[in-house]
């Protein structure tokens, strides 16, 4: 761990610790240990075959939840270093924030949430926490990964008060309107930077959106013009890459400068004092407006594109069919999950489906419903 952390940064010495006590790791900080445990987890490896926007088999070059998580971690660490925050904590949060995502991206989550409405619903942040607290089975003396409080808290972006009470100390900030650590705030916005800009990149690669369309979007048009001015002969993938690269750099610089100013003005002197302040990590008003314009464009032209909607519809059908089949006949679950169904009820079905990769979900559907000669 760096020795020049700001007093308001989370550190080993002011961490609230782990649910189950462990001796301090040799040669690593507490949050390096958290990061390492996440990277070595089964759930993390599965992210390689979980959708970001495009279903995994649609192309080899589109982003997955794994590549997205790595990109978020890189952005988060860069900003954390400039703000003298705890880079290892930011990395641990960003690498674990999507562990609970279903197959097929948001279409899969929406479908599973609908299936679970009667049983408390489904939300991927809470499922990510469940993965690191309960579902990973790697260690001799505890379930889950036994991560530090601050890493676990950082996984949770939004939790309704109706569910926050069941989270004990983790739910306190949602019940009382307190802020999260600066590292958690940063991880949230690093996710937003990566998500929007890399969806632009993937959308252009897929051909579902075009440069001509994006030239109507202020932040993209400005950076496209700058790239063309600097490199008059640039075309194709290089032009797109340099434009997206410039957009990400602008957002990183803006977030760093604006957040640094807000932190100085608020003068927090400890991680606990941060919780009593309003959210301090944020963009300028201009960048927020431009980001919202880009989000609206992506929602209308990429996420609602008929080809993406077709993929989403197939994903929803697959998730719903798997859930209702297992609900009606739990004996069709793998034996391990039949046992868990006895203990957790429908949550066990949600755990099983949420843990699937895109490919596994498709194959499980085929195993259950496809009639073949074999």
From Swiss-Prot:
Domain of life: Bacteria
Domain HD residues, every copy: 65-196
Key words of the record: Hydrolase
One biological process term in Gene Ontology: dGTP catabolic process
InterPro entries in the cross-refs: dGTPase, dGTPase-like, dNTPase_2, HD/PDEase_dom, HD_domain, PHydrolase_assoc_dom
GO MF entry, a single one: dGTPase activity
Family stated for the protein in its record: Belongs to the dGTPase family. Type 2 subfamily.
PANTHER family linked: DEOXYGUANOSINETRIPHOSPHATE TRIPHOSPHOHYDROLASE-LIKE PROTEIN, DEOXYNUCLEOSIDE TRIPHOSPHATE TRIPHOSPHOHYDROLASE
Designated name of the protein: Deoxyguanosinetriphosphate triphosphohydrolase-like protein
């Amino acid at each position: 761990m760096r020795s020049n952390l700001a007093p308001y940064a989370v550190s080993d010495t002011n961490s609230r610790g782990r649910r189950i006590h462990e001796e301090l790791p040799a040669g690593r900080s507490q949050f390096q240990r958290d990061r390492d445990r996440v990277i070595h987890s089964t759930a993390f490896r599965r992210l390689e075959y979980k959708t970001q926007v495009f279903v995994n088999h649609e192309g080899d070059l589109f982003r997955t939840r794994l590549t997205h998580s790595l990109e978020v971690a890189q952005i988060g660490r860069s900003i954390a270093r400039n703000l003298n925050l705890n880079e290892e904590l930011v990395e641990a949060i960003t690498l674990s924030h999507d562990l609970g995502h279903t197959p097929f991206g948001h279409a899969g989550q929406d479908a599973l949430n609908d299936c679970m409405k009667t049983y408390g619903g489904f939300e991927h942040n809470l499922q990510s926490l469940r993965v690191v607290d309960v579902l990973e089975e790697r260690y001799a003396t505890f379930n889950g990964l036994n991560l530090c409080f601050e890493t676990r808290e950082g996984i949770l972006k939004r939790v309704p008060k109706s569910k926050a009470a069941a989270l004990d100390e983790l739910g306190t900030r949602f019940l009382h309107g307190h802020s999260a650590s600066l590292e958690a705030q940063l991880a949230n916005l690093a996710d937003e930077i990566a998500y929007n800009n890399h969806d632009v990149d993937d959308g252009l690669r897929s051909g579902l959106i075009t440069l001509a369309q994006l030239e109507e979007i202020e932040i993209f048009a400005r950076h496209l013009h700058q790239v063309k001015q600097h490199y008059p002969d640039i075309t194709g993938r290089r032009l797109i890459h340099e434009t997206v690269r410039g957009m990400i750099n602008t957002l990183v610089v803006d977030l760093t400068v604006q957040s640094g100013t807000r932190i100085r003005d608020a003068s927090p002197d400890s991680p606990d004092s941060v919780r009593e302040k309003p959210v301090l990590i944020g963009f300028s008003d201009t960048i927020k407006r431009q980001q919202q314009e880009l989000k609206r464009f992506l929602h209308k032209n990429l996420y609602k594109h008929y080809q993406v909607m077709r993929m989403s519809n197939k994903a929803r059908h697959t998730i719903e069919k798997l859930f209702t089949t297992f609900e009606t006949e739990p004996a069709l679950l793998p034996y391990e999950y039949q046992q868990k169904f006895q203990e957790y009820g429908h949550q066990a079905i949600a755990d099983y489906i949420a843990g699937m990769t895109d490919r596994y979900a498709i194959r499980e559907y085929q195993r259950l419903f496809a009639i073949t000669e074999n």
